[in-house]
Amino acid sequence: MKLPIYLDYAATTPVDPRVAEKMFQYMTMDGIFGNPASRSHRYGWQAEEAVDVARSQVADLINADHREIVFTSGATESNNLAIKGVAHFYNKKGKHIITSKTEHKAVLDTCRQLEREGFEVTYLEPEANGIIPMERLEAAMRDDTILVSIMHVNNEIGVIHDVDAIGELCRSKGIIFHMDAAQSAGKLPIDVQTTKVDLISISGHKMYGPKGIGALYVRRKPRIRLEAQMHGGGHERGMRSGTLATHQIVGLGEAAAIAKAEMATDNARIAKLRDKLWNGIKHIEETYVNGDMTHRVSGSLNVSFNYVEGESLMMALKDLAVSSGSACTSASLEPSYVLRALGLNDEMAHSSIRFSIGRFTTEEEIDHAIETITQSIDKLREMSPLWEMFKDGIDLNQVQWAHH
């Protein structure tokens, strides 16, 4: 068993060996290395053909038309292109956007930028289980609302939003619906024929593809228009200029095809491991799951261990590659804004760990993780005066702490 054990699949996934092998055929002189936009010779034609196949594979994953797939550098760019692209194109119709407080920074910071440009953004508060109630979304809608951006699966707590209901509501009001599917594409079935979603952001490295590649689904019927954010040679039907990275696109396509074929078996195995992990640690006193346990993606478990400081717990769990918060924000010592939005206090938010399980996680690794977590919590609580006070029956909320 290789240490540390990788339990941070929500941050990134290793490239599946089958994907890596396929990608390697599109890089060197011996392979298909041409520019897909070179129309005058075979090197270009072969590369273009490979891109076309990959485009269809990504489209198949969400039951879309291949012409609705735009390749980008990842979900961050897809989110920027979708949100800014809609805002700038439809700004004559209205300048109001709705999103939620628990979105990824790539959505929140894009909305903040639009606020600086004169747009108005409503940030919806989730329930304690992490899910946005439909009536709250409907109440926020106005005549000048042009876009709703709600993620499919949350990156920190793994809860699943009812995107079918959100899509129905948006369509009935004539509002464009963008869904960040970085954490759900390849893990949950997505069908754009039944779900009324207009724009979907997809990430390669969250589904065993390479980093630096993603896609944006842009609905054709009814047609969604975007203002390009990257200008140049007019690639990707004018929506995203830049030479197409054939090897990465092929990798994304192959990853999508594998994810589609193996989704059901992968999910069943991963859910079993996730439940084994939770059943192995839930007996630890003052341990709580964050987010809804029923509407949750199979590989995700976000747990708060009360009276244990998150950073010291991370250090104690050095044999486990886990995170507190998401990789994009865990570099700062701020408590997770997602958990704060759920109503957790700073202490509980600080004592949370995100475990995310994936395709290559084994039962042996989960057994080792349970043992490590149990021992570490016991050891840290032995050293904690707060734990001692709690065990003595002192209500810590009533304690008058002296200020120095």
From Swiss-Prot:
Positions bound to [2Fe-2S] cluster: C328
Residues bound to pyridoxal 5'-phosphate: A75, T76, N155, Q183, S203, G204, H205, T243
Molecular function as annotated in GO: 2 iron, 2 sulfur cluster binding; cysteine desulfurase activity; metal ion binding; pyridoxal phosphate binding
Catalytic activity of the protein: (sulfur carrier)-H + L-cysteine = (sulfur carrier)-SH + L-alanine
Coarse class of the protein's main subcellular location: cytoplasm
Essential cofactor(s): pyridoxal 5'-phosphate
Subcellular locations according to the entry: Cytoplasm
SUPFAM superfamilies documented for this protein: PLP-dependent transferases (SSF53383)
GO cellular component: a single term: L-cysteine desulfurase complex
PTM-bearing positions, type N6-(pyridoxal phosphate)lysine: K206
Record key words, sorted: 2Fe-2S, Cytoplasm, Iron, Iron-sulfur, Metal-binding, Pyridoxal phosphate, Transferase
Keyword flag Cytoplasm: yes
Origin: domain of life: Bacteria
Active-site annotation: C328 (cysteine persulfide intermediate)
InterPro entries xrefs: Aminotrans_V_dom, Aminotrans_V_PyrdxlP_BS, Cys_deSase_IscS, Cysteine_dSase, PyrdxlP-dep_Trfase, PyrdxlP-dep_Trfase_major, PyrdxlP-dep_Trfase_small
Claim: ATP-binding is one of the keywords in the record: no
Protein EC: 2.8.1.7
Record GO biological process: [2Fe-2S] cluster assembly
Pathway given in the UniProt record: Cofactor biosynthesis; iron-sulfur cluster biosynthesis
Complexes and interactors: Homodimer. Forms a heterotetramer with IscU, interacts with other sulfur acceptors.
Protein family (similarity comment): Belongs to the class-V pyridoxal-phosphate-dependent aminotransferase family. NifS/IscS subfamily.
Function: Master enzyme that delivers sulfur to a number of partners involved in Fe-S cluster assembly, tRNA modification or cofactor biosynthesis. Catalyzes the removal of elemental sulfur atoms from cysteine to produce alanine. Functions as a sulfur delivery protein for Fe-S cluster synthesis onto IscU, an Fe-S scaffold assembly protein, as well as other S acceptor proteins.
Record's protein name: Cysteine desulfurase IscS
Lineage start: Bacteria, Pseudomonadati, Pseudomonadota, Gammaproteobacteria, Alteromonadales
